[in-house]
Amino acid sequence: MASPAQPAATMAAFARMVKGQVRSYSAPVDMAIPASKRKFIPSSGSYPKGFVVSGTHVGVKASNTKFPDLALISSETPCSAAAVFTTNKFQAAPVQVSRDIIKTRQGQGIRSVVINSGCANAVTGKGGLEDAVSMGKKVDECDGLNEPSTLVMSTGVIGQRLPISKILKKVPVAHANLSSTHDAWLTTARAICTTDTFPKLLSRTFTLPSSPGRTYSLAGMTKGAGMIHPNMATLLGVLCTDAPIEPSALQSLLKHSVNRSFNSISVDGDTSTNDTIAILANGAAGGAPISSSSSDDYAAMQDILTSFAQSLSQLVVRDGEGATKFVTVRVQNSPDYESGRLIASTIARSPLVKTALYGKDANWGRILCAIGYTQGVAPGTVVPEHTSVSFKPVDGSPVLNLLVNGEPEQVDEERASVILQEEDLEIVVDLGGGEKGEQGLGGEEAVYWFCDFSHEYVTINGDYRT
């Protein structure tokens, strides 16, 4: 594959702004990255061996006249691949095509992922499926491959056909510009953005127990700011590693990590037609392949991948449409993980909780209400007289108790106001009445991340197609 140097993705290119416009409204446009978000954009990275990427301008949406909206992520050698997809019944064409490719290839021999922003290619019938197939096939042709080896993703407005001729014309350009530089990775992450205010890219190095002297790398990019809720939302993500992992192990590793990361975030409670998180592992760094779930390497990789996916998914919440708060809800002393996750999810989805946090109102009754109406939890999970709720400040100061063992506390409203002025907040729900396991509930903990609802969220989504 060609790997020419890619033009530097400068901050200036991201910092220009259309007058009066805050977000990109389903296709990249001139926009300013909020000062508070610039700290999340990496200035360098540690990227996996054998992977090259590019971001290319197509103009999928007519209003985008110059910014990259076609992303290509490729490995110079065949990869193991795994993916998780949306549970929405109206699954977009690229979701159907990518799912079939992974199934047919049994997670082996995948080389690339191609992604367009600006059009979701969802609810587009037979023609949409043909378009998705043709996108992947064009990449395969550039690689000289005869078998389907490219996963396809799309994001943007639902119900519109892709300008497929424009896209196919630019795929060879994207392929020719493939590069391994940090600027290339950042430009590629920008190419998948829609209403995002900043590109979301992370990378890290790690070691495995079987090869403590060998360094591996893991990189990931994601997009999403609205229509975000688990079981996947307008949320796309691609993870790449040069560690050697067999397909069956890779699928179970990804599922575990996604359940505790991308499936544990919420912006607005809506689940998209296009959600996909995929991971490619090319083994370019060498070492023994991870194949058994009972191995030390598997356990280590599970922790590494889960932690990485959590950090990546949290960037989506921090960029939630109109968000002013990043909220962690921690449910403790649940009889099982899933019951705790359901309670955390219900709190995170509650419009009343989200608007109270935006208004800096310590209205803990709304949190308690959400706990009480949570569906699907194990019997006996929620016992009012054993339940406690508190705010945990990010500055390390003592928690502010709101409810203890079912009894309301005399809340210091002034201190509550100070805590709620901060961008970050943690809500702790203890189902066991205090100390872990005190009520014999098993001590399981589930964590969820969400943001508040503001006036801007309504404005952004009211104007989405304009």
Curated annotation (Swiss-Prot):
Catalysed reactions listed for this entry: N(2)-acetyl-L-ornithine + L-glutamate = N-acetyl-L-glutamate + L-ornithine; L-glutamate + acetyl-CoA = N-acetyl-L-glutamate + CoA + H(+)
Keywords linked to the UniProt accession: Acyltransferase, Amino-acid biosynthesis, Arginine biosynthesis, Autocatalytic cleavage, Mitochondrion, Multifunctional enzyme, Transferase
Residues marked Cleavage (site): 233-234
Enzyme Commission number, as recorded: 2.3.1.35, 2.3.1.1
Matches recorded under Pfam families: ArgJ
Subcellular location: Mitochondrion matrix
Broad class of where this protein is predominantly found: mitochondrion
Site feature location: Involved in the stabilization of negative charge on the oxyanion by the formation of the oxyanion hole: 155-156
Signal peptide segment: none
Metabolic or biological pathway: Amino-acid biosynthesis; L-arginine biosynthesis; L-ornithine and N-acetyl-L-glutamate from L-glutamate and N(2)-acetyl-L-ornithine (cyclic): step 1/1; Amino-acid biosynthesis; L-arginine biosynthesis; N(2)-acetyl-L-ornithine from L-glutamate: step 1/4
EC class of the enzyme, as a word: transferase
UniProt PTM comment: The alpha and beta chains are autoproteolytically processed from a single precursor protein within the mitochondrion.
InterPro entries on file: Arg_biosynth_ArgJ, ArgJ-like_dom_sf, ArgJ_beta_C
GO molecular function, one term: L-glutamate N-acetyltransferase activity
Any single GO BP term: L-arginine biosynthetic process
Any Gene Ontology CC annotation: mitochondrial matrix
Active-site residues, as the UniProt record annotates them: 234 (nucleophile)
Function, in words: Catalyzes two activities which are involved in the cyclic version of arginine biosynthesis: the synthesis of acetylglutamate from glutamate and acetyl-CoA, and of ornithine by transacetylation between acetylornithine and glutamate.
Any further remark recorded for this protein: This protein may be expected to contain an N-terminal transit peptide but none has been predicted.
Subunit note: Heterodimer of an alpha and a beta chain.
Family: Belongs to the ArgJ family.
Protein known as: Arginine biosynthesis bifunctional protein ArgJ, mitochondrial
